[in-house]
Amino acid sequence: DHTLKLGGGVRQHRYQAGDAVLKLNDARDPLPAAERQPIAALLVALAGLRAPRELQDPDGNAITLVPAGHEGINGVAVRLQVADVAQSSQFYQQVLACTEVSPGVLRCGKALLLLEQASARCAPDTAPLAAKGLRYLTLQVFDCDAAYASALAAGAEGAKAPINMGSTARIAFIRDPDGIWIELSERASVT
C-alpha cells in the first residue's frame, strides 16, 4: 500500500491485510540471522480457500494461508512458541488486554495469538530487533506513552522507550516473557 523510510537504510513496506497491516522491513545492509524464531508463523485467512497451504517467504519464514474461519481465524493469526503457555497467556491478558478464546488461543483486537509450548526460552534476551525473520508484533494504541507506562506497570520488560517517527507515529517496544518484541504504535493516521 505504501512505503516509509525508517532511517539507517531501512524502508518499511506496508500492506493492508483486512483489518491488519503487514509490515515488511527492507534493509540496505545485510541483517544478522536471529538465533531462534519465537514468532513461528503468520497465518492469513483467505475467502474461497478450501484447505490450509503452508508456504515460506524468500527468507524461509513460515506463512500459512487458511480458509476463512479455520481454527477461528478470519483475518490474521500469529503462532508464538513460548516456554510456558499459561504464563504467556496471563501476560498477554494482563499487560495487553487480550482475551482468552480457549487455552493457548488469545484474541488481540481482530487477530489471534496462537501460543505453542516450546522446549526452552525461544528468544534470548540479546536477540536484536533488526534481524532476519518475523521479528515483532505491532499493536495500534491511542496513546503510546500511556500504553508503554501501563505495560511496564503490569510487568512487561521495557525494550525501547517511546520515540517519534517523524509525524507518522510515536512508537515504543516492550518484550514478553519469552523475549518477543511488541511494538506499541500511536499512528497519526489511525489515532
Language-model regions: role of each:
Residues 28-29, 67-69, 117-120, 187:
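Acetyl-CoA-dependent GNAT
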Residues 157-163:
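Short, basic/aromatic recognition patches
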Residues 52-70, 182:
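Short, structured interface segments
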Residues 37-44, 64-90, 95, 99-102, ...:
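N-terminal beta-strand motif that seeds the catalytic metal site of vicinal oxygen chelate
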Residues 94-95, 150-155:
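Short amphipathic alpha-helices in soluble, non-transmembrane regions
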Residues 11-22, 27-56, 74-84, 125-152, ...:
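Vicinal oxygen chelate
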Residues 1-22, 79-118:
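Core segments of cupin and vicinal oxygen chelate
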